[in-house]
């Protein structure tokens, strides 16, 4: 039914996408040709395609147990990262993406991971600070579905195609870069060039499906925040959570919020299916 899918970024809110996709995909027999994801949405698009949603959620929720802080001061004093979420994310990616699973994904669809390239000759710490600051400010003031501040600053969009990943390490580097939000997540390096969170250019990179839409092929964009209005673009459908998801993007101590996001995705997926059935009956 949909030839292209977009998984927007959103950190832990992206577990909503897992619940929605797992509910809707079997009923609609979704077999998209191209799937694009940014930040944690890029991970969500891949583990849902592999049918590993339950495993990922349980592993993450288990890792949250017993944690009272987002920071690891003891590890930091010994030379580790202050925010352990980045190392935890990398460890999970290394466990998930074997050579066999990469081959499975490459044979299934044209998956693309969105990253942002900072302006050339900018020191990376400056680029990260300005890019993330501009993104957050625009989000708070304008609440756009598609951000524009990053492009105006000179950030460039880039896509890493899974078919060009020769080994799991290439995919893991792309996923880490797509979620790169210092100091929470480390800066990325892809193709010997610096890379930051794909959401700094556009958190919902539907631009990567524009050629399909222009050719008359329908696409579906999975957002991770409730929105009151979306752009009206031919052949594009947006879906979003029906309420605010009570979990912060990078938290590693809120398993209840992660489960809530997933369960809300299931409910919203069922509501979406009912709306499609109602439209079909009205025709």
Regions found by a protein language model. Give the residues of each.
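Patatin-like phospholipase
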Residues: 1-38, 46-283
């Amino acid at each position: 039914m949909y030839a292209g899918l977009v998984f927007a970024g959103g950190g832990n809110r992206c577990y909503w996408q897992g619940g929605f996709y797992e509910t809707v995909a079997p009923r609609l027999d979704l077999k998209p040709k191209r799937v694009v994801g940014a930040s944690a949405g890029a991970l969500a698009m891949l583990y849902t395609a592999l049918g590993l949603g339950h495993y990922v959620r349980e592993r993450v929720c288990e890792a949250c147990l017993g944690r009272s802080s987002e920071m690891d001061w003891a590890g930091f004093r010994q030379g580790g990262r202050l925010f352990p979420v980045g190392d935890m994310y990398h460890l999970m990616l290394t466990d998930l993406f074997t050579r066999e699973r990469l081959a499975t994904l490459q044979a299934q669809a044209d998956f693309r991971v969105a990253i942002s390239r900072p302006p050339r000759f900018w020191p990376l710490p400056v680029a990260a600070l300005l890019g993330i600051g501009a993104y957050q400010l625009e989000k708070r003031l304008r609440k756009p579905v598609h951000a524009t501040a990053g492009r105006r600053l000179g950030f460039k969009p880039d896509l890493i195609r899974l078919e060009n990943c020769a080994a799991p390490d290439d995919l893991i580097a792309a996923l880490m870069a797509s979620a790169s939000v210092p100091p929470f997540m480390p800066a990325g390096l892809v193709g010997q060039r610096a890379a930051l969170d794909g959401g700094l250019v556009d958190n919902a990179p539907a631009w990567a499906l524009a050629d399909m839409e222009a050719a008359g092929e329908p696409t579906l964009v999975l957002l991770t925040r409730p929105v009151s209005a979306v752009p009206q673009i031919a052949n594009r459908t947006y879906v979003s959570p029906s309420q605010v998801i009570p979990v912060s993007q990078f938290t590693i101590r809120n398993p209840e919020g992660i489960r809530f996001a997933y369960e809300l995705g299931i409910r919203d997926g069922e509501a979406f299916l009912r709306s499609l059935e109602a439209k079909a009956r009205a025709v």
